Amino acid sequence: MPKQKPHILLLSVGLVLLFGFTACVMAKTYIAYSKQLNRMAVIQTAFENMAFCRPYELSSEGFCLSPTTVLTDAEGKKSPLSEVVSAHGRTLVYRFSRMNCLPCIVMHFKLLKSILDDRAQMGLIILCDYHNARDLRILRNTYEVSCGLYSVDRLGIPIEDVNNPYFFILTQDMRCEGFFTAFKETSQQTENFLRALLEKL
């Protein structure tokens, strides 16, 4: 019997190590599963938000902006909207507010910079509601904005009630079309949308 004690000890140590390894694997699996569930929940919420925004996008289609709408640039210069739209007939507009989701705005600026070349940026304007020219300059320098960046009050478009950043096309006759409400959780959909819009500019 005494000779069996080392075997029992080794077996006990082996069982402890096995249980420890199993517990570690199960814990890691649970953490990974929980993260996946959280990610899926976030994406589901984003798509639910997109579905909620869709009626506002549709009701904004065809909305005509006033060509005399006053825009203010980072130097404090004021210009009517008709003077800043693309001479090529269509302008891609990115509109956001100070009250919008900051991570969304950061992601959108990075996305615009990564997929728009110099030619495409000439057909882009960014509209926000920073009424202080200094804040506009900080924004321009922070995100290295090379396209038109302007401050403007509410445009009166239904989609503004959603309180989320959005993109749309502005035609030369001031008609709005192709609205898309963008969320940071759906960056791939936003990129696909922007690439499709670029073909129309």
Regions from the language model: what does each represent?
Residues 1-8:
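Short, Lys/Arg-rich N-terminal segment immediately upstream of the first membrane anchor
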Residues 10-29:
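Hydrophobic membrane-insertion alpha-helices, especially the h-region
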Residues 34-84:
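N-terminal "domain-start" segment that seeds a small globular fold
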Residues 76-115, 122:
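Short active-site neighborhood of thiol/selenol oxidoreductases, capturing the structured segment around
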Residues 98-104, 131-133, 182-185:
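Short acidic, S/G/P-rich loop/turn micro-motifs used as interaction or catalytic elements
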Residues 105-142:
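Structural microenvironment flanking redox-active thiols in thiol-disulfide oxidoreductases
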Residues 137-170:
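Short, internal strand/loop/helix patches
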Residues 169-201:
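Thiol-/selenol-based redox modules, centered on thioredoxin-like
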